[in-house]
Amino acid sequence: MQLSGYPMRQASCDMKEGGLRNKVAVIGSGSWGTAIANLLCKAGNETILWGRDENVIDEINNARVNSKYLPGVELFLRATCDLDYAVADASHVYIALPSFALSKVLPKLSLDKFSIVISLIKCLEPDTGRRMSEVISEALDLGHNRLAVISGPNLALEVANDEPSVSVVASANIATANIVAGTLKCPGFYCIPSSDIKGVEICAASKNLVALISGIARGMDLGDNTRAALITLGFRELLRLVLENGGTEETVFGVAGLGDVVATCNSHLSRNNKAGVLLAKGAPLDEVKQTAEGVVAISGVLALAERSGVYMPIAQALSQVISGKRTAHSLLDICFSLA
């Protein structure tokens, strides 16, 4: 589909002046990792995608698709199961792994001393509440100028299908954010550099809870009025958590905060939204956990809230629903008692 004002991207890696701009590695061959790797390739970077599943990697290399995680999308990149090969000489390394996989993969990364590492992970570390950039920084011994995160309304299938999208690239060093944004420069994909890495990461994790609540309301066949009220109440807790931890209102009410909440709560592509529907319908917890990482990562949000003295009764009640200690109906009662 051709959108007026948004030219479709080239069906191959664009050659810029002086050749390909950067050697880029993406670690993680799930839907978002594959989508961002394909985008980076289209933006003119020499891109290689790493994954553990040999069947997925072989399919990407031979059939140019990832039918398991991103069906129906033609891919223009190379993929490998060799981690050392993937990151060799890479100037930028994107991390698109589930949070539970970091402890297994990060120690194996052998990076160039000037490599910039970019987190695509939208959660906080379970039980500790540490931001993913903090976890990565400690594991790889990286300074702030070599760390960045990307967040926003980033539904992988829409990005992969060239739907116009806006994301925030955040780093404590704004120069780093600008450098990373440059590697992603591509028609239809727009990046806003930011130095509010704390706010962006906390928004990314907390919005999962809002989406779960929205999904629960949807799964209970409640109307849009109810769902809108629940989203607003959940968003209010997100706002308090971000501001108390040094984030800014500009981030919360921008695409990394409000924008991500709108997309995640309203799209049928949102896994956290789907997980909320499953919770409302009484699906087994294992099935819900497999649907979205946000279900597991709620403990990280609550840990950060406790550490920073932020009262989040809706998040606490949601955690009890997930653990089976509370019904979805009682969650609604708590939400509306706070209105």
UniProtKB/Swiss-Prot annotation:
Subcellular location: Cytoplasm
Disulfide topology: none
GO biological process per UniProt: carbohydrate metabolic process; glycerol-3-phosphate biosynthetic process; glycerol-3-phosphate catabolic process; glycerophospholipid metabolic process; phospholipid biosynthetic process
UniProt key word NADP: yes
EC number(s) given by UniProt: 1.1.1.94
Superkingdom as given in the UniProt entry: Bacteria
Naturally occurring in which organism (per UniProt): Tropheryma whipplei (strain Twist)
Free-text function comment from the UniProt entry: Catalyzes the reduction of the glycolytic intermediate dihydroxyacetone phosphate (DHAP) to sn-glycerol 3-phosphate (G3P), the key precursor for phospholipid synthesis.
Keyword Iron applies: no
Cellular component terms per the entry's GO annotation: cytosol
Residues that, per the record, bind sn-glycerol 3-phosphate: 122, 152, 207, 260, 270-272
Binding site for NADPH: 31-32, 52, 122, 156, 271, 293
Similarity comment: Belongs to the NAD-dependent glycerol-3-phosphate dehydrogenase family.
Key words, A-Z: Cytoplasm, Lipid biosynthesis, Lipid metabolism, NAD, NADP, Nucleotide-binding, Oxidoreductase, Phospholipid biosynthesis, Phospholipid metabolism
GO molecular function: glycerol-3-phosphate dehydrogenase [NAD(P)+] activity; NAD binding
SUPFAM superfamilies: 6-phosphogluconate dehydrogenase C-terminal domain-like, NAD(P)-binding Rossmann-fold domains
Cited PANTHER family: GLYCEROL-3-PHOSPHATE DEHYDROGENASE, GLYCEROL-3-PHOSPHATE DEHYDROGENASE [NAD(+)] 2, CHLOROPLASTIC
HAMAP family: NAD_Glyc3P_dehydrog (MF_00394)
Catalytic activities: sn-glycerol 3-phosphate + NAD(+) = dihydroxyacetone phosphate + NADH + H(+); sn-glycerol 3-phosphate + NADP(+) = dihydroxyacetone phosphate + NADPH + H(+)
Residues forming the catalytic site: 207
InterPro entries for this protein: 6-PGluconate_DH-like_C_sf, 6PGD_dom2, G3P_DH_NAD-dep, G3P_DH_NAD-dep_C, G3P_DH_NAD-dep_N, NAD(P)-bd_dom_sf
Protein name, per record: Glycerol-3-phosphate dehydrogenase [NAD(P)+]
Pathway the protein contributes to: Membrane lipid metabolism; glycerophospholipid metabolism
Taxonomic lineage: Bacteria, Bacillati, Actinomycetota, Actinomycetes, Micrococcales
